[in-house]
């Protein structure tokens, strides 16, 4: 592809305190719906750039470990010698860059790709002024005034910088940063001051976007999780004003079973599920409308978080409590083995058959599986063992209690 860009992602600071439930993480490795921010940025730019430079300082080691599979000629981590403001971070990153440049803040995901736009440009949005964002005035592409996180003095909406910029002349932009360092303005980041200077020589297109997902502020982060989740799962729609999730599924038998499981829970263990507002178990069009939770899943905590040992003990104690609480409700029946075999054997083998059809799992069925240096049987061999062992284990069982049939990390949310 012609006209490939360079991408700079400033990621020098950790997320604010209100987002540190997962630990003190930089925005670039903060999770949003089973991925981290960089996963989205990489997918967006990988076909449009020669390199992506991630500029780190706080918790740089965590970024290096988490992004290690990505590191290559195209993806590089650079560590600041000392922490300065945003302008100093960008200045350090610029080095001798001469080709067209994209600057994308590490906590900003915009689904519109600025690399597809010609010329100097940046994304913006309109909102009422607050001390959360950096706003601006512009005329004919020239930024005439910047309001850098200033309290509101007007009830009118103004344009704000989203956090994605395209610079066609990075050599001159570096000169603009040097001027901004000399003309210190306490109320404005040197980056925005330099951008203002740059726009006088190179007018910039201010492009409005509605596809902006911000993970650097608590309120916007949870709103972004809502919208990104709805985009990624075409059977989910979310009413963010009411906090209601509506779900459908092509796998109707499994989905109807899930709905019935929700509905049949005894009232004093309903705390484990969202409130249900509407549903249908009709085979024609099954659906459920339920309360949407924006909590992190245990999957996110395990893969992307930085929890202490005690925090993990607390998480598993809560899971154990739920499992023990379920044991209060039992069914005793001498002919229960068929239902148990359906749950523990048939369901497992059905899942294996689905996996076998997916290319990424197919080799696991024929070849030994190696995990952390230990080798295990191929899944075909494990299936054969299960078919013999599980029925024998169930012969003497005549009591069954409530269980969750898919209690995996991705299905457990922790507040």
Q: What are the residue ranges of the model-derived segments?
A:
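Short beta-strand micro-motifs within the conserved protein kinase catalytic domain, predominantly
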Residues: 275-286
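Conserved alpha/beta core of the MobA/IspD/sugar-nucleotide pyrophosphorylase nucleotidyltransferase superfamily
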Residues: 3-8, 158-240
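Conserved kinase catalytic-core helix
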Residues: 299-358, 382-403
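N-terminal nucleotide-binding beta1-loop-alpha1 segment
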Residues: 1-25
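Conserved beta-loop-beta/alpha segment of the NTase-like Rossmann-fold superfamily
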Residues: 63-64, 71-138
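Conserved core of the sugar-phosphate nucleotidyltransferase
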Residues: 109-185
């Amino acid at each position: 592809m012609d006209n490939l860009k360079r991408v700079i992602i400033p990621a020098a600071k950790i997320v604010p305190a209100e987002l540190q439930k997962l630990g003190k993480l930089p925005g670039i490795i903060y999770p949003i719906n089973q991925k981290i921010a960089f996963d989205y940025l990489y997918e967006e730019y990988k076909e449009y750039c020669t390199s992506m430079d991630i500029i780190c300082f706080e918790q740089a080691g965590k970024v290096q470990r988490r992004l290690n599979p990505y590191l290559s000629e195209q993806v590089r981590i650079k560590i600041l010698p000392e922490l300065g403001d945003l302008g100093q971070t960008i200045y350090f990153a610029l080095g001798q860059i001469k080709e067209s440049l994209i600057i994308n803040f590490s906590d900003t995901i915009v689904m519109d790709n600025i690399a597809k736009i010609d010329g100097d440009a940046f994304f913006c949005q309109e909102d009422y002024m607050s001390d959360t964002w950096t706003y601006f005035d512009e005329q004919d592409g020239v930024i005439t005034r910047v309001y850098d996180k200033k309290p509101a003095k007007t009830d009118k909406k103004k344009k704000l910088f989203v956090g994605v910029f395209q610079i066609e002349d990075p050599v001159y932009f570096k000169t603009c940063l040097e001027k901004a360092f000399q003309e210190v303005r306490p109320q404005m980041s040197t980056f925005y001051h330099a951008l203002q200077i740059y726009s006088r020589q190179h007018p910039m297109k201010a492009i409005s976007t509605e596809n902006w997902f911000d993970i650097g502020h608590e309120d916007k982060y949870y709103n972004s999780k809502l919208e990104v989740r709805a985009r990624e799962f075409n059977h989910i729609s979310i009413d963010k004003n009411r906090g209601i999730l509506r779900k459908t599924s092509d796998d109707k038998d499994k989905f109807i079973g899930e709905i019935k499981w929700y509905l049949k829970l005894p009232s004093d263990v309903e705390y484990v599920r969202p409130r249900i507002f509407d549903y249908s178990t009709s085979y024609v069009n099954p659906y459920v409308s339920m309360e949407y939770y924006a909590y992190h899943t245990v999957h996110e905590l395990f893969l992307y978080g930085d929890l202490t040992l005690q925090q993990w003990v607390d998480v598993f104690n809560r899971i154990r409590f739920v499992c023990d609480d379920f044991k209060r409700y039992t069914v005793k029946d001498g002919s229960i083995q068929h239902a148990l075999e359906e749950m523990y054997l048939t369901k497992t083998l059905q899942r294996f058959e689905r996996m076998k059809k997916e290319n990424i799992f197919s080799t696991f069925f024929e070849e030994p599986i190696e995990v952390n240096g230990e080798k295990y049987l191929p899944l075909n061999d494990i299936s054969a063992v299960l078919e013999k062992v599980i029925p024998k284990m169930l012969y003497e069982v005549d009591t069954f209690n409530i269980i969750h049939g898919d209690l995996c990390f991705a299905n457990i949310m922790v507040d």
